[in-house]
Every structure is written in structure tokens, then in C-alpha cells.
């Protein structure tokens, strides 16, 4: 059991996502930083899409009520257990009565807390992911207690398993994100396209799990921003009438009525997600679909083959 003592501004349960319901207007949700989420599960030997606690934008505190092994991945947090510093991206052991603190620091927005054995939560529409606007999934509030799962790996020592720094995403305040040509690129003037591909945009503080609003040089349309609403994809970049791009993220709506100038490669979405509002800047680099697919596969391989496993898996807690 783990109890929430202090919630962050954005705290939720996120698994691999709620798939199969977008045609009904239900977003997939899932983690803002898919790499950190997947790596957290891999480090504690859970399944890739198992549920983690996503902590976002501010600090959080937890009371550990059951002996367990945990890992915290992501960026922008300093982790302590009973006041003792713990290394992110490295598995450590907690005992009943411990207090785990995730202190918000510069350098990122989102952290993922994964427990060996997973979290025992009911699914809603095939997923445990929280989607606040529709009331789907568990609302994580102060005093909420989460029961841990009982998968076999939870009994084996995983302490020390880690993903080396060189295998982690290169988070930072200056991001160059790969992107492909969008559905409506012909709806923009040459000057507008040039602005998009050559401007370093800042992150508007009015950003959230649905989308990051960017600020910078205005992107000029040929015939207006509005279109008949069409499906939107994770990473698609819409440009409304004000000419400021909006990057669709985990809780993005299933349809949108603004022109889509580009789609960000899934490989680089974690870099954007961890880019701090009001501080970070994002510039887009045009790539082909094939290049984007290759880059994503390479990121997955970093998790699958990059974990240091210099521990005795058969040492019991």
C-alpha cells in the first residue's frame, strides 16, 4: 500500500493508454513522457504498459505502507526517501513507514513512480489511465491509498537496476524536435511555413496535459485557420487564427477544427513534454516519416537493451 500525503498540480495514474475509443470522442490519455514511463516499468520488470503514478509540475509526498521496490524516472525532480537522496532512473527499496518525497526542481515537468508488481486498480474502458475531464480512472487526492500488485517479480531484488544517463532522453531547455509535414501544410503561405520551421518557440504557461501552446513568430495562413473538424493525432501541431502553434499531447481531443501544419515524431515528444513553460524553447526539424519511425524504434531499443542489471534477482526482500 502507498498513501498520497501531498499531491502535485498534475498527479494521475497513467498506463499505456485507453485505446479503441477515439471514435467516441474519448482520448487515449497515457503518459506525457512515454519514454520515462516505459523505462520505469522496465526497470522494475513490469509490463511496458502497466500503470505508474505520474507526478507533474509541482512536488509530491508519499507514505510507504508496504515493503516494496520502486523507481522514479523523468526530469525536473529531486527524490528523497526519509530525507536521504535517491538516484532517479535507479531502483531502490522502500520499507513500511518510509516517506518518499519528489521535490520539484528546474529541468523538467514530469516524473513517473513505478512499483515492482504494479498497482492494483480497476480498469475503465480497458485502461486505468486518469482522464480528468470525463472522470475516467482514479482521482489521486491527499489521503488516497493505492494497493500494490502481486506479480512474481515483486519478490526478487531489483535494487540497483538502472538506465545509464547516455541512454536517457537528452532533456533540456532548448529542444530541437523532429516533425513531419502536416495534413494542411498547403494552407500556409511560404512565409508562414518558413516561420514555423525556423522559429524557436517558447512554451506558454497555459499548457497542460491536453496540449502545449507555443509562442513566437506568427505563422501566416493563406485562407484562414478554420477547417471542417478532422481527427487529430498525438503530436499533431495545430495553428489557430492567432498564428501560434499548439502541440497535441496525451489528453488531446480526438478532433480539431484548426489547420495542422506538422506532426511531431513520437521519438521527440518526451523532449517537448519536459520542456518547462515560460523557460524552455522548441524548434522543429523537418524529417520524413521513415526517419521518424526509425528514431522511435531506436528510442525503444535504448530501454530494451540499455538497462544495467548488475543485481541478484533472487535475493528476497
Where are these regions (language model features)?
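Conserved "landmark" site that anchors the functional core of diverse proteins
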Residues: 1-317
Amino acid at each position: 500500500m502507498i498513501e498520497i500525503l501531498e499531491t502535485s498540480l498534475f498527479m494521475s495514474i497513467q498506463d499505456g493508454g485507453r485505446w479503441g475509443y477515439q471514435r467516441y470522442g474519448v482520448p487515449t490519455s497515457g503518459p506525457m513522457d512515454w519514454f520515462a514511463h516505459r523505462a520505469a516499468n522496465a526497470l522494475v520488470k513490469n509490463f511496458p504498459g502497466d500503470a505508474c503514478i505520474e507526478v507533474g509540475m509541482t512536488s509530491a509526498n508519499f507514505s510507504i505502507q508496504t515493503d516494496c521496490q520502486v523507481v522514479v524516472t523523468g526530469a525536473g525532480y529531486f527524490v528523497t526517501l526519509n530525507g536521504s537522496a535517491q538516484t532517479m532512473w535507479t531502483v531502490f527499496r522502500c520499507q513500511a513507514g518510509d516517506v518518499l518525497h519528489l521535490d520539484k526542481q528546474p529541468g523538467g515537468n514530469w516524473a513517473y513512480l513505478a512499483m515492482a508488481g504494479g498497482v492494483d486498480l480497476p480498469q475503465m474502458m480497458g485502461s486505468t489511465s486518469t482522464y480528468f475531464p470525463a472522470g475516467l480512472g482514479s482521482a489521486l487526492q491527499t489521503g488516497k491509498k493505492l494497493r500494490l500488485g502481486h506479480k512474481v517479480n515483486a519478490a526478487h531484488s531489483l535494487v540497483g537496476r538502472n538506465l545509464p544517463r547516455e541512454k536517457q532522453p537528452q532533456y533540456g531547455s532548448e529542444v530541437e524536435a523532429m516533425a513531419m509535414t502536416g495534413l494542411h501544410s498547403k494552407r500556409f503561405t511560404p512565409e508562414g511555413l518558413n516561420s514555423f520551421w525556423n522559429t524557436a518557440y517558447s512554451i506558454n504557461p497555459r499548457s497542460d496535459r491536453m496540449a502545449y501552446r507555443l509562442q513566437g513568430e506568427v505563422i501566416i495562413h493563406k485562407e484562414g485557420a478554420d477547417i471542417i473538424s478532422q481527427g487529430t493525432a498525438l503530436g499533431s501541431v495545430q495553428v489557430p487564427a492567432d498564428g501560434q502553434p499548439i502541440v497535441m499531447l496525451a489528453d488531446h481531443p480526438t478532433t480539431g477544427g484548426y489547420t495542422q501544419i506538422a506532426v511531431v515524431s513520437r521519438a521527440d515528444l518526451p523532449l517537448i513534454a519536459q520542456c518547462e513553460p515560460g523557460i524552455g524553447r522548441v524548434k522543429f526539424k523537418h524529417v520524413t516519416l521513415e526517419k521518424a519511425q526509425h528514431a522511435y524504434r531506436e528510442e525503444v531499443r535504448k530501454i530494451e537493451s540499455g538497462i544495467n542489471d548488475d543485481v541478484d534477482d533472487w535475493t528476497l526482500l
